[in-house]
Each structure stands twice: as C-alpha cells, then as structure tokens.
Amino acid sequence: AASDVYKRQSYQFQDTEHAANLFALKELGHIYTRIGNPTTAVLEERLAALEGGAAALALASGQAASAYAIQNLAKVGDNIVSSTDLYGGTWNLFANTLKDQGIETRFVDPADPENFRRATDARTRAYYAETLPNPKLTVFPISEVADIGKEYGVPLIIDNTAAPILSRPFDHGAAIIVYSTTKYLAGHGAAIGGAIIAVS
C-alpha cells in the first residue's frame, strides 16, 4: 500500500520542552526532513522488514549508502577488503575517494574466499561485496566470507541491489546491507536513492 508523501522540510513542536527533547534525542520524532520524515520512515521500516534487519537508513543514492557504511567503520589508516567484482561507480569510490580520505581498499578475487583472510590485518574494518555483482552476476560466497570476518571481528557489508527479493544476506552472516534503491526497488528507475540496513 502506498503511504502519504510529506513534502515539508521542518516540523512543528508542541512547545520548547518538546523541541529540546527531540534535539537532545531524549524523545523520538521528526525535526528536519534531511534527518528523517514520515515518508522516509515508512520506506526504512519496509526495507528493514524485507531483509529481516533491525533498522534502515534511507540516503540520497546507493553510492552514499556504501560510503556511509564504510566511513562509520573505518578512519584514516584503516582498510577494507573488497571483492574485485564491483559496479564501476563503487570501484571508483573505493579506489579513489576512500583512498583520498586515507582509507585503503584491498581488492581480492572472490572466487577464493580465503583471499579475504589473506588480505586482513589489524586495521581491517570491513569486508565488502555485491550479492550479484554488476555486470558479471557471479554469486558471491556470503556465508564463507562472513565466517572468516567473524573470526577477526570484521563485519561483511553486502550490496544487495541486484537481488533484494532473491537473497537475504543477513541469513548468511552479513552484518550490513546496502542498496541502490534506484534500480529494482524503485521499480522503474525514476527516483535516485540508497539505503543501509543493519542486522538485528
């Protein structure tokens, strides 16, 4: 069922105490649309339910989702280990933008899950892969790589853009799922968006 669309950028407060509680995060509610609104909240709840996750965060694009997920785990001097089989935009994000921010990406061939182990060190903060990578569509070994990550305390981030109805990465050990909602979730390519979903 379709939900209402809220087009406002700010919200009315009951009184100053209500506003203070919202801004102090003592009370849940909407403050400013960039942070969240009722329409976005419905999307986030539905995406979390689709994947069996605890919560979701809607963002402006799939690239934003990938960047947010990694930048919340890694900082200057850290690294991530990524599958070589990636959408070109994600490859460029990792090889250039993250590098410029001081986060190294170690690209490995996903055909052998042990490549993730071999590339892991004390500064590895995440593993990253696509369920069905664009354009190869080779199935990524989620369970095997997630198990390796658990040995080192390294979460597996899975881009599930190509397979949201076909695959539930949390069921196979992934810790975080990202999407470009522009593709199959939007259904017609008329809206750009992205999302991050956290495991329960």
PLM regions and their residue ranges:
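Short, small-residue-biased leader/transition segments that mark boundaries at the very start
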Residues: 2-6
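C-terminal substrate-binding/catalytic lobe of Rossmann-fold NAD(P)-dependent oxidoreductases
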Residues: 7-13, 17
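Residue-level marker of positions within ordered structural domains that often coincide
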Residues: 12, 52, 199
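Conserved N-terminal alpha-helix of the aminotransferase class I/II PLP-enzyme fold
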Residues: 15-67, 89-97
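Conserved PLP-enzyme active-site core in the AAT-like
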Residues: 56-200
